[in-house]
């Protein structure tokens, strides 16, 4: 069997997407619901775990056990200001475990806590399975994307999530870089082109400027806001309608999580409608305390509610231009990425900023990142086709990196927006006479003083021979690999003593043991999900056997043939089973199968006797051999999602 291709996964804050490069082109893969993007949602119920559409669809009924926005927590500390402010908006519980955030849920009547990496790994597992269902092969290799603003800890945690999901992460790349690759494959241009990528997604906003020259991408600058996106526009709508509901009905629906959730779902729908229509209506039956809510909103009102947010998206564009030292007149192309770039007002503001320049919308904004990631995955996985051979990728560091020197000053070794992989060495010395050692403290950030930057890790270099201050020479080397993982080495020249650190664990990263445990747990949950599916199939099989059997008794050719006592025997047994089913919704697979055998033991001899007695040809039995209700698992197949439609309530 040929090996499966590597896939590209856009692990988004609100939605995720997976693509694969094969037969010379990228295919974005639809999930089992037929959607090309999958909500980054995981839900826990009394009986099962749901991921993706199924999780998002039941969020109104189960808000406290439905987890989303794991990307806002991944690689962060619990007391991080962003985490603390986000927690106010989440219906689920976030607790601190050794300074790291964990999400607390009740699953199968037990309290469980999960690291953000575990939740993200469940979404990644869903994307992996989506690709496997399409390719018909086991998928192990993947490129996963992250926002340009993610620091080392967040990148590392995302990589860990991939490992827990059973993926070999070939590389972590920036989302805008991935979009640029997608764009580069679409439009091969002669000479150097400067491209501005405007990525306004569900949860993050990134602006990047790249130069593309002869198939080589270079990221000139990145800017943005890790906390701006479609969800913020939804929030404004929700607030607007909550106030309207108060005015109209004198009731405050913020006291009811489920009502808020249903309103939010309707707002998201209205927002999407307003990208193509100038008006959208909202109709929610019995939203709060039996009160229906019917209203509408115009595009103009929507734009007014979000005016400041829309305008604020222009600042990072100007910052990115300043950082890249480019005038807006030399930008050749503007590329839109992220679902929120469909909003006409955002497009208009951007176009006005660039003096009416046409925007590039040729790539589906929801899929561009996964598209580029799929191409990059093919390159790294050794795809030899001409289409990808002409592409090379240069990524950059999102923040400056350096060490603390005397007086708490940040001494930068690697400037932000430096192309990676990269290696920089600088020589430092001692601050006082006969100093026996130095403490190397590694920081990331743009501020002059280290106290305002982010400490990545620290280590001691001891054993420096006694000498006056300023004499010893200590060589500090910063080495960043293609994944943005940093190695820092300090070497004392006279003794050749050295010490080093890899910036991973010191940042509250999960330990190897943790990751292994989570990999095993992920496997356990997968098995439980499988078991749950089989149980439901057995239950549905038994149910349809009962109803099919009752229907068989009413068929014209049987009505007259069957004796009243046989008829009563079957009916009683079927009704008894249906009653048992109603009372035992949570029985296990074996019980359902046992009941089915019992029922078949009663019904089959009677039905067989009838058919033989009547001399019907075997094909005349309902549906031919094996077509008897539930025989040979026919009814069970429908329950297992074979032929039977799955109906989910969308609230």
Swiss-Prot record:
One of its GO terms (cellular component) is perinuclear region of cytoplasm. InterPro entries: ATPase_NBD, Heat_shock_70_CS, HSP70_C_sf, HSP70_peptide-bd_sf, Hsp_70_fam. Disruption phenotype: RNAi-mediated knockdown is lethal in larval third instar (L3) stage. Glycans are attached at residue 35. Residues 621-651 are annotated as: Disordered. Residues 621-630 have a biased composition (Gly residues). Keywords: ATP-binding, Cytoplasm, Glycoprotein, Nucleotide-binding, Nucleus, Stress response. One of its GO terms (molecular function) is ATP hydrolysis activity. It holds the Pfam family HSP70. It is found in: Cytoplasm, Perinuclear region; Nucleus. One of its GO terms (biological process) is regulatory ncRNA-mediated post-transcriptional gene silencing. Belongs to the heat shock protein 70 family. Associates with the elongator complex; this interaction is required for some functions of the elongator complex but is not required for regulation of microtubule dynamics. This is Heat shock 70 kDa protein cognate 4. It comes from Drosophila melanogaster (Fruit fly). The gene is Hsc70-4.
């Amino acid at each position: 069997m040929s090996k499966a291709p590597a896939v590209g996964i856009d692990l988004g804050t609100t939605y995720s997407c997976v693509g694969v490069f094969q037969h010379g082109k990228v295919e974005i893969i639809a999930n089992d619901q037929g959607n090309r993007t999958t909500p980054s949602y995981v839900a826990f119920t009394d009986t099962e775990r749901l991921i993706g559409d199924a999780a998002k669809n039941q969020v109104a009924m189960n808000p406290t056990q439905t987890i989303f926005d794991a990307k806002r927590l991944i690689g962060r500390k619990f007391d991080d200001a962003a985490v603390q402010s986000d927690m106010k908006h989440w219906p689920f519980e976030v607790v601190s475990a050794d300074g790291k955030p964990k999400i607390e849920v009740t699953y199968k009547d037990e309290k469980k806590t999960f690291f953000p990496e575990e939740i993200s790994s469940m979404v990644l597992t869903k994307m992996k399975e989506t690709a496997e269902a399409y390719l018909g092969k086991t998928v192990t290799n993947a490129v996963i994307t992250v926002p340009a603003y993610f620091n080392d800890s967040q990148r590392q945690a995302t990589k860990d999530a991939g490992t827990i999901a059973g993926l070999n992460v070939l590389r972590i790349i920036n989302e805008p870089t991935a979009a640029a690759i997608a764009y580069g494959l679409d439009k091969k241009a002669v000479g150097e082109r400067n491209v501005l990528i405007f990525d306004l997604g569900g949860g993050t906003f990134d602006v990047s400027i790249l130069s593309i020259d002869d198939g080589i991408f270079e990221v000139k600058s990145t800017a943005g806001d890790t906390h701006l996106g479609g969800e913020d526009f939804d929030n404004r709508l929700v607030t607007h309608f909550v106030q309207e509901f108060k005015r109209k009905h004198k009731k405050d629906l913020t006291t009811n999580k489920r009502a808020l959730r249903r309103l939010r779902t309707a707002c998201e729908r209205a927002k999407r409608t307003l990208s193509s229509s100038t008006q959208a209506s909202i109709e929610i039956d019995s939203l709060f305390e039996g009160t229906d809510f019917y209203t509408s909103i115009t595009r103009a009102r929507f734009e007014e509610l979000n005016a400041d947010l829309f305008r604020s998206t222009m600042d990072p564009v100007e910052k990115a231009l300043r950082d890249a030292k480019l005038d807006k007149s030399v930008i050749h192309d503007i590329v839109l990425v992220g679902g929120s770039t469909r909003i006409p007002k955002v497009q208009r503001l951007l176009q006005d900023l660039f003096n009416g320049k046409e925007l590039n919308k040729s790539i589906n904004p929801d899929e561009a990142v996964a598209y580029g990631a799929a191409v990059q995955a093919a390159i790294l996985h050794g795809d030899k086709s001409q289409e990808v051979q002409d592409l090379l990728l240069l990524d950059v560091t999102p923040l400056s990196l350096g060490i603390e020197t005397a007086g708490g000053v940040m001494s930068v070794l690697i400037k932000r927006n430096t192309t990676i992989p990269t290696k920089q060495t600088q020589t430092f010395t001692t601050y006082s006479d006969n100093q026996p050692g130095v403490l190397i403290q590694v920081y990331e950030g743009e501020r002059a003083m280290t106290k305002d930057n982010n400490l990545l890790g620290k280590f001691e270099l001891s054993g420096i021979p006694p000498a006056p201050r300023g004499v010893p020479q200590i060589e500090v080397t910063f080495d960043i690999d293609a994944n943005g993982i940093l190695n820092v080495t300090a070497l004392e020249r006279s003794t050749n003593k050295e010490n080093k650190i890899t910036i991973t664990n010191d940042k509250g990263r999960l330990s190897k043991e943790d990751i292994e445990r989570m990999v095993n747990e992920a496997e356990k949950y997968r098995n439980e999900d499988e078991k749950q599916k089989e149980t439901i199939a057995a239950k549905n099989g038994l149910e349809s056997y009962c109803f099919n059997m009752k229907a068989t008794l009413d068929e014209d050719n049987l009505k007259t043939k069957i004796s009243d006592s046989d008829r009563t025997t079957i009916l009683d047994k079927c009704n008894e089973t249906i009653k048992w089913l109603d009372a035992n919704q949570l029985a296990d697979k074996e019980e359902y199968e046992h009941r089915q055998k019992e029922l078949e033991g009663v019904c089959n001899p009677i039905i067989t006797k009838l058919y033989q007695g009547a001399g019907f040809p075997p094909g005349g039995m309902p549906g031919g051999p094996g077509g008897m209700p539930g025989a040979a698992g026919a009814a069970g197949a429908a329950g297992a999602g074979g032929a039977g439609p799955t109906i989910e309530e969308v609230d």
